[in-house]
Regions:
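Amphipathic alpha-helical dimerization/coiled-coil segments
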Residues: 1-31, 53, 100-133
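Alpha-helical structural elements
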Residues: 4, 70, 91-92
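N-terminal helix-turn-helix DNA-binding core of bacterial DNA-binding proteins
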Residues: 22, 26-69, 94-103
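Hydrophobic alpha-helical membrane-insertion segments
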Residues: 49-50, 85, 110
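Beta-hairpin "wing" of winged helix-turn-helix
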Residues: 61, 81-91, 98
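Residues within the DNA-recognition helix of helix-turn-helix
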Residues: 76
């Protein structure tokens, strides 16, 4: 089969049917892809985990906790806020950030646990087996 051709007759019709029935609808796949893109940035991920632990922090305290500059934290918070994951509470000239709600927090805690497990089991790292050779 050359590039661009379609396969007209399935080799295994039952598995093709299972694959079709088990896939995400296009819009859900698009939304999930966008969310994973938001979560895919290390600083944004660290901001979220810091807010899980501390509940609420200002930009400066987040920058100190993460040991990164305030511009990086501010940008990360803007992206997270745009996607509805964090909210800002104004207190005079200060802004304090927290996760949007308890559902966001509990969903994020569970998602992080699952993602950490996936990363530990499926991504290269210290536990990587030597390549054959």
């Amino acid at each position: 089969m050359t590039e661009g051709e379609t396969h007209e007759h399935p080799v295994d019709p039952e598995r093709v049917a299972a694959a079709r029935s088990g896939q995400l609808p296009g819009e859900q796949a698009r939304q999930l892809g966008m969310l994973l893109g938001v979560l895919g940035d290390p600083i944004r991920m660290r901001i979220l985990t810091a807010l899980v632990a501390a509940e609420e922090l200002c930009v400066g305290d987040l920058a100190l906790a993460l040991e990164v500059n305030q511009d990086a934290v501010s940008y990360g918070l803007r992206v997270l806020r745009r996607h509805g994951l964090v909210q800002r509470r104004a207190a005079g000239r200060m802004g304090f950030y927290r996760l949007t709600n308890r559902q966001t927090r509990s969903g994020l805690v569970e998602a992080l646990r699952q993602l950490q497990e996936l990363a530990r089991n499926h991504l290269p790292g210290d536990h990587q087996e030597p390549e054959p050779g």
